[in-house]
Amino acid sequence: MHLTAENLAARRGEDLIFVNISFHLAAGEALVLTGRNGSGKSTLLRVVAGLLKPEKGTVIFRDGEGWKDRHPGEASHYLGHRNAMKNELTVAENLEFWRAFLGHPTAGLPLEEAAEAVGLSGITHLPFGYLSAGQQRRIAFAKLLVAHRPVWILDEPTAALDASADRLLAELITAHLAEGGIVLAATHQPLGLENVQQMKMTGFAGVDHGVWG
């Protein structure tokens, strides 16, 4: 299983945000994007997720079953700044919608198990809008667990989380990688992960590569 981006360029309005960005991730690997606001982190994530058309370049996901090339959007979870949940629906109703929309009903954790995995068991009957900002973000992560997809694309995943939730998030990502998943994340702070690739976005000037470990 591989996720490959080659010579990507993207615009915001009339302006080029970045050019010639390439990376390659195999099963069990993660790439963390860092850089100042406006440097193109979120734009790159949206391009890889298939939510924004690149100015040039290609993104290919190749699965391990017959080595079929697919667009990453067909095999990925995208978690943006917003949680993509309806406040008036219960937690269970929100998660059930995403499970049906994103994957096979049996290819993921049951709803209560997913809620327990993010430390919020016993609240799936509550309206999503009743939850605190931190609880809402945790439930957004439960969405990744109820429908299995091998690629996680995460934009500032620690937003609204406290230190204990940060650690829980790191554990979830580590477990996903250990199972052969791929993670592409943008953040302003370390995610508590070991031996992951790092790409520092510097806007149109380019990117710098490194490794956190």
Model-derived features with residue positions:
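Helix-to-loop junction immediately C-terminal to a conserved catalytic motif
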Residues: A49
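Catalytic Walker B motif of ABC-type/P-loop ATPase nucleotide-binding domains
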Residues: W152-E156
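Conserved ABC transporter NBD signature motif
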Residues: P54-E74
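Q-loop/switch helix immediately C-terminal to the Walker
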Residues: R82, N87-L102, P110
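Conserved ABC ATPase "signature" region
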Residues: E96, G108-I123
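Conserved ABC ATPase signature
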Residues: P127-G134
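Hydrophobic anchor residue at the start of the ABC signature
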Residues: F141, G180
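A short, proline-enriched helix->beta-strand linker immediately N-terminal to the Walker B motif
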Residues: V146-P150
